[in-house]
Amino acid sequence: MGRVIAVMDVGGTSIKTGAVRFDDGDDDSRIEVGPGLPTNSNEAADVVLDSLAAGVDAALDVAGRNVTGLAIAICGPFDVDNGISQMQGVHKFEDIFGIDLRAALRERSTVSGLPIRFARDAESAGTGEALAGAGAGVDRVLTITVGTGLGSCLTDHARPVEFIDGFGVEHLAMRETPWGGRADDVLSAHGLAERLGVDMADLRAAVEDPANADIVRDHGTRLGTFLAPVVAEFDAHVVVIGGGFSGSFGRFGPALQSAIGAVPVRPAALGPAGPLLGAAQLTFRP
């Protein structure tokens, strides 16, 4: 019969929903992507929690009656074991700091007694792409998600590597850059929006505007310059760029590749399905 996992991927601006269906004794999986919803991550706690609960209900609708669990990929810092947000000073989710999301979602959604398990969003994206996307068939894949923040995941044979010589891979975004701030602030899509003087909601249009081409290419160069020593440090065989900004890869990707050097750089191939697959795999099929 297999298992059906309802999944949602929670980012700083939007929630992606869907379901992953695993067949017993088979490595194959089927992914169904559901509706996307706004996160409202800069609103008061009640608004944010109601938005997350709406995402849960949407994912459960996609999964249907035979659902056996709920997997949530979520940005961080986040305590995935206890389901508690630790986000402060990262431009999102400030008002749900310290809240037990499992309990809050049981109160506000129809999840009832189903098991709820959390995974880091970058690890979910990286695992999905390593299993069936741009990193499939490559031993060591460094996935960088470029969205409201900057996420990082290193996989070895599609399994996350948490530490390199004692350094937590997920903390890459906290490293300082030569451009006056942490990578999370400077090299994320939020950082580019600040350079362009636009709101996040208007970033896609601004990136596509030819008048901004030089700044967008320079952003790719900066990201590649930052990542080049990381690729060597992590012994990555390919770099995959995911997150909301990956849709504009054609605008910044060549400059990024030039700055990184010989190791190939690819845009994520699975779109919203990647983190959904990865989250279900990490939480219910480890």
Where are these regions (language model features)?
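ATP-binding/phosphotransfer module of carbohydrate and carboxylate kinases, centering on a glycine-rich
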Residues: M1-G69, D79-I84, L105-I116, G128-L142, ...
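Short beta-strand segments
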Residues: D9, A71-C75, A119, L142-G149, ...
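Short, flexible active-site-adjacent loop segments at beta-strand->alpha-helix junctions, enriched
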Residues: G76-F78, H91, A122, G147-L150, ...
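A charged helix-plus-loop insertion that forms the helical arch/lid used to bind
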Residues: I84-G98
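Glycine/small-residue-rich loop that forms an oxyanion/phosphate-binding "nest" at active or ligand-binding sites
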Residues: R117, E123
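Adenylate-forming
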Residues: S124-L131, G151-L154
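Hydrophobic, well-structured mid-protein blocks that either form specific transmembrane helices
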Residues: S152-L172
